[in-house]
Amino acid sequence: MNCQRYFCFVNGIVEIRTAPEEYQNKPVLVGSQSDGLLIIDNHADIEDGIFSTLHIGNGYNGAVDVINGAALHMDNRSGSAPLIVGAFGNDIAGKLNISGRNSIVSYRDTPSSSGHNESIYVGFGPGATGWINIFNGGVFEVLNSTNIYVGSDTPGGGDGSIVIDGSNSKMTADFSEAYVGLYGNGDISLKNGGQLSASNLYIGGNGRAIVNISGTDSRLIANMITISGSSGAPGIYIADQGILNVDNYINITTANDTKGKLFINSDMPGTIESKGILFGVGKAELIFKHNSDNYAFSSPLISKNTGNGIINAESGETHLTGDNTDYSGLLNILPTASIDISSQKNIGKSVIVNNGVLQITSQDDWTFNNNMTGNGYLNVHTGGHNFAFQNSTNTQEFTGTLALSDTLFDLSDDNTTALTSALVLAGVGSVITAGTGTQVINGFSFDGGAVNFGAVTQGAQQTESQIQVTDNLYINGNGAVRVSTPTDVNGIPQVINSSLSLLEQDDSNATIKLVDASSAVVKGNGGNLQLQDASGQVISSGKQRNIVQQGKNVAKGVYDYRLTSGPHNDGLYIGYALTQLDLLASGVDALVLDAAGTTGNAADMSARITGAGDLAFNSQKGETVSLSNQDNDYTGVTAIRGGNVLMNSNSVLGQTSEIRLATDTRLDMNGHSQTVGKLNGAAGSVLNINGGNLTLTDDGVSAGTLTGGGFLNISGGVLDITGGNHTFAVSTIIAKDATVRMNDVSGLGTGNISNAGTLSLTHASGLLSNNLSGSGTVSLINSDTQISGNNSNYSGLFVVDTSSQLTATGAQNLGIASVSNRGILQLNNTTDWQLINNVTGTGNVRKTGSGSLTVRSNAAWSGQTDIDDGSLILGQSDAPVMLASSLVNIAKNGKLTGFGGVVGNVTNSGSLDLRSAAPGNILTIGGNYTGNNGTLLINTVLDDSSSATDKLVIKGDASGKTRVAVTNVGGSGANTLNSIEVIHVDGNAANAEFIQAGRIAAGAYDYTLGRGPGSNYGNWYLSSSKNTPEPRPDPEPTPEGHDNNLRPEASSYTANIAAANTMFVTRLHERLGQTQYVDAITGEPKATSMWMRHEGGHNRWRDGSGQLKTQSNRYVIQLGGDIAQWDWGGTNRWHLGVMAGYGNNHSSTGAVRTGYHSKGSVNGYSTGLYATWYADDETHNGAYLDTWAQYGWFDNHVKGDGLPGESWKSKGLTASLETGYAWKIGEFSSNYGNLNEWYVQPQAQLVWMGVKADELYESNGTLIESTGDGNVHTRLGVKTWIKRLNKMDDGKSREFSPFVEVNWLHNTRDFGVRMNGEPVYQDGTRNIGEVKTGVEGQINPHLNLWGNVRVQVGDKGYNDTSAMLGVKYTF
């Protein structure tokens, strides 16, 4: 940092780890020409006065990081803004990051700072964005009245964000105003105990405005909060016990038709403490969406203008307790929500849309004066006080229910008109007084309350007050009807019409009409309603008579005043009729109810049925008798002998000890509840729960059909269910002492089963699809059952007997239950499964399906284990499992893997996989092992004898054939002087065969699997040596030489690098011939040569160990020609030429020890220059000098048996210098006058070979490095030839020169390869003898041919044979 007299500045990054004295009381600027970053770290404490001002990023992005307990304290002595982070640039950003316990940034003013600019800017200037991030106990405190701008403070956009996360993380600005995104988006997030306090807080401006407060002790404290936003969904979201504390008002305003939200959500909603919530312009919204049933909201709600504000209650029960008198916005209650109030001021003048519950609880009179629509519930409880509607028009569109409890209500005038579209429910403790005349409402229901209809006129057919319903009349509940002149009721004829059926006698003499429902639907028959006087006393004049059927007294009937829906079921009447039946007879003598062709009320019994006798039903097939009195309490048998029975209310079957359903009969519970002792349904009968709730307390048999939805509770005894019930969809509860026995998996249909008792399946096969829960027992007896439901909440016990099979396909099927298995447990999973269930027993466990099954110590079964498909995984590395199974059968598609082992025997027809993340896994078989052409898979670090490896330990005997596949994990290959033990057999292994499966290769070596010698004959070892040695001595001696199994690929790599360096090596006499050309410089006719040669060769050699035998075939084509000649006078001449070539070499290597083979190939191109000097260019006698240089590039490939193919490239330079001297040692004539000239030419050549191969990593990780480049190849030899001149060829320019050449070749380096550093080289090439013979000839002035055959012989069986043909054509 550059500190001058008055200020300090720097560009880029400044990190301060100790308090810097040189900055004392000076302005500091970081980033004047680039982004600036100031890091204060390592508990550095920057005290007041060190920085007079701090500006980070001047026209660039800026950031301040105060971390790891560091502190930055500032005051305002300079008179300018004390802290600016990121300023004066379009779209720049400023960040203040405070993280770590005791990390703090603080600012306080000084007495001398009066009138100074005390604002703090994080993101300064038009369009600037600002972030304040406080984590892990960091603190930002402003200790005086200072404006804080997060994001731009001037128009032009610019977002602001404050994130405070973690306990003790806080920002304190109690005397300051904070602006977050004043002209853009504003975001504040307080999490996990983060806290923010400010005097006034302004969030958002031209964009989004969001505040999130979540987590215990997360708290936002302010004197006033203003949320503004013109886009998105601006608002405050409070969850998980977060706290919003505002001393003044929370102001929610929006623009551009957006919604501003104050959101209370989560299971544990947060708290708001404020002077009030101001709903301003726009769609300002308060949302309650939580799961609490007792959440209190006390902040007052205020509409700035009439109609401002929306309160959405989306879920949970919210108590509005504040003074909301000035709220005139919308209160919207959704079906899953409830709003509770105790004072009119709690809902103010709100307009209510009620599709949920509005609960009024008060101890005073209540006049409802709000406008309300919707179809929900208005529940009113006034503690015995009056409730009324102030204005009849406010609720005329409310189509829901007015539910009154402990409340007085006058059904007349405005109260009646207000309920034009609603239903009135008379709840417990409520008294409704019907006004004089007819009161028309939508619907009426009794639920324990009373209705006072006033006086009854003697002889009249109605009371002075009557109710008319237009939609529904519910008289199937409890309640009371009151009249004020009970003596006039006595005028009703007390006549018993014996000519009517018993089912019609409960509706007879319906004389005085109280409720007219002639255009409505009537549900129930009024049998549970009492007739009372005005004081609530029962009006009664009862008579009793015997009920005789078939000459026997079967019951006693009681006749009295009662309420009824009348014979036509068209309202509510006072009549004199049957009110009670006391059952006396049982069995065949039981009271019989018979529809006898009637329907409706004529086939309904609304009188109370009591007594200890039985009740029988015997209608014709298809005819129905209904019961509608929920006070029935008879205890005898309910025998449905014929026809159907319909329940029209709860408990209409009383306390019956048994329901008997005969063939072709039907009981329809019609959505109602009933408790009975036994259920006995005959085959062909139907029990339709139909949305109801049936409880069985004793034994029973269901041989008929069970159907419908609802609930079935078996609280005791044994219920036998015969056959399937596919349309039965109830939720079944089996209590602790109860049992359900089924012979069909769909006996309980498809619904959920909560089982705390016993669910027994006998001879039941198929899919049990029900979702199970509870802690009871599911027992299989001679059954083959697959459980397919989601039983995650089932913690009970599955019991499988010896003749049964239980099948599960996933963890959710078994839940967390235990399994006691004496039969077959089949786990048929196609996805991976961690078995957490305790499984015991002597039965078989069968693993099928392609997924894996991992077992822990909970796998305690001792029976046989069959792994038919997929994998069975034992334990984990730190928690191995010894499977207690007596026998494990691994099928062809199965695999056993993991850690630990098997207590019993193992038969392997599939895979026994010991591999894991690191080698060293030892799997133990406590019994015998039988290989049935299965595979053993292990990981080994293929190095020396001490290498880490997986191992199979067999405590018993071993037999059969097993393939062993070894994977190298990081081994580089080495000489295993004493081998690596991978299989150990304590018992007899004479009949066992563990056979190596595929190549086991690492580095330069092939490892082989074989038995140990001598006493270790029962063990199997991996070795890279020729023979399996005795066990390792201690200490292990150092290996010497190559007494190990080399990989054939080593010689393939070697053959490639050797061929690439040698295939384009040429000699002068392989480029013979001359043509004429015009010198490009002098224009004189000159002699030139244009040549091409073809060579094919065959090569044989061995590596240095003698293990690898290689032979290869090559082909080379080269062509070239002179491009310039010059001389220095006389007959000497220089020739300069160019040449190019293509060649390929294909090799094959066999390893004599292992029998493995590999193939290699290399093909490439070369281009180069040559230069030749002849002392006598005309005769080529005397001395010559020849040199050339070529650059070659090659593609290489190697493929070994059982290994992936490898490819790489090589390239480099080769160069040669050759010299010799030719002279004619004589001439002689032969027959026919032919002249023969004899020449001898000693030769010497020096070739430098510099082709290098790229470094290669094989697929198995072996590093391949070719060697031998830089070899200097020398040749010393002599060539002799005879030039024959035949008289027949005079003037034809035809001549022939047969020759013989002998050479000694020497190489300074051997071509080879290093495989993971282990060298393998081509042997026998240091000194090579060569014999070559051929002929050179000119056919005519235009065509020259030459060819030769060459044989090279070296040491160690090296030999090379080649043939070459050259051709020249003169144009």
Swiss-Prot record:
Keywords attached to this Swiss-Prot or TrEMBL record, sorted alphabetically, are: Cell outer membrane, Membrane, Plasmid, Transmembrane, Transmembrane beta strand
| Superkingdom of the source species | Bacteria
Q: Identify the PROSITE patterns for this entry.
A: AUTOTRANSPORTER (PS51208)
Q: Where is the Autotransporter domain?
A: 1083-1371
| Annotated protein name in UniProt | Uncharacterized protein YuaQ
Cell compartments where the protein resides: Cell outer membrane
In this chain, the stretch annotated as Disordered covers 1020-1048
List the biased-composition ranges (Basic and acidic residues). Answer: 1029-1046
Q: Which organism is it from?
A: Escherichia coli (strain K12)
One GO cellular component term of this record is: cell outer membrane
What CDD domains does this protein map onto?
Answer: PL2_Passenger_AT
Membrane-topology annotation of the record: Peripheral membrane protein
Which InterPro entries does the record associate with it?
AC_1, Autotransporte_beta, Autotransporte_beta_dom_sf, Autotransporter_pectin_lyase_C, Bact_Autotransporter_VF, OM_autotransptr_brl_dom, Pectin_lyase_fold/virulence
